């Protein structure tokens, strides 16, 4: 597969894909915006604490690989970045809105069940039911230009198998989780996290509006 992203590259691209949909008024993102998005505590696994220089290094590498492009010029005092990873004018990778939502959530959080993905991707795309989530995952797993996701072996006590993206190479199944409480509470945790994401983004928008009013 021609797409081979490191963990940090996957985080940066996932953040840009997410913000392009959820906060379009703040997109493209500056370096500081990307740092904030990479290090935010909601909808991220693992939570990171990247420095500006670390993020800048990833941005430079991704620009060289044509996965991102810089936006500058009249009206832009600082360089900003937008993704060319998918659905760009000259790129080969074309994804539907549902596919973008799932891929983004997998890039940001790693392996997840369809139920977790539906809750956590809700800010990007509203799936009508679980069947739509599962059919979209199957499409991503069986695309001629893919596969882009893989279904992992079901863990003991879990009702659903987890899926993982393949943009960082082949995936080895992680050791099985035996904590039954984790299995039972997974969907509830995902719904709580989705609400936390929504609150954080509303706060971010409010802060941005207040900053503009103060100018």
Curated annotation (Swiss-Prot):
SUPFAM superfamilies: Winged helix' DNA-binding domain. Belongs to the UPF0502 family. Pfam families: DUF480 (PF04337). The keyword rRNA processing does not apply. NCBIfam families: PRK11239.1 (NF008413). It comes from the Bacteria. The modification N6-acetyllysine is found at residue 80. InterPro entries: DUF480, WH-like_DNA-bd_sf, WH_DNA-bd_sf. The keyword Transferase does not apply. This is UPF0502 protein YceH. It comes from Escherichia coli O7:K1 (strain IAI39 / ExPEC). Keywords: Acetylation.
């Amino acid at each position: 597969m021609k797409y081979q992203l490191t963990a940090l590259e996957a985080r940066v691209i996932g953040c840009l894909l997410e913000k392009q949909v959820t906060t379009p008024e703040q997109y493209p993102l500056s370096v500081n915006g990307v740092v904030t998005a990479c290090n935010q505590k909601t909808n991220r696994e693992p939570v990171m604490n990247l420095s500006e220089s670390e993020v800048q290094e990833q941005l430079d590498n991704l620009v060289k690989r044509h996965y991102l492009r810089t936006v500058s010029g009249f009206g832009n005092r600082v360089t900003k970045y937008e993704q060319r990873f998918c659905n760009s004018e000259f790129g080969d990778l074309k994804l539907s809105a549902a596919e973008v939502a799932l891929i983004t959530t997998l890039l940001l959080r790693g392996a997840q069940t369809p139920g977790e993905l539906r809750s956590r991707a809700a800010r990007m795309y509203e799936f009508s039911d679980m069947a739509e989530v599962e059919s979209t995952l199957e499409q991503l797993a069986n695309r001629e230009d893919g596969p882009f996701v893989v279904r992992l072996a079901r863990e003991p006590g879990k009702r659903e198998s987890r899926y993982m993206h393949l943009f960082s190479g082949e995936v080895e199944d992680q050791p099985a989780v035996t904590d039954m409480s984790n299995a039972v509470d997974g969907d509830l945790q995902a719904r709580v996290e989705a609400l936390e994401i929504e609150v954080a983004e509303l706060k971010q928008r409010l802060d941005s509006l207040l900053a503009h009013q103060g100018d």
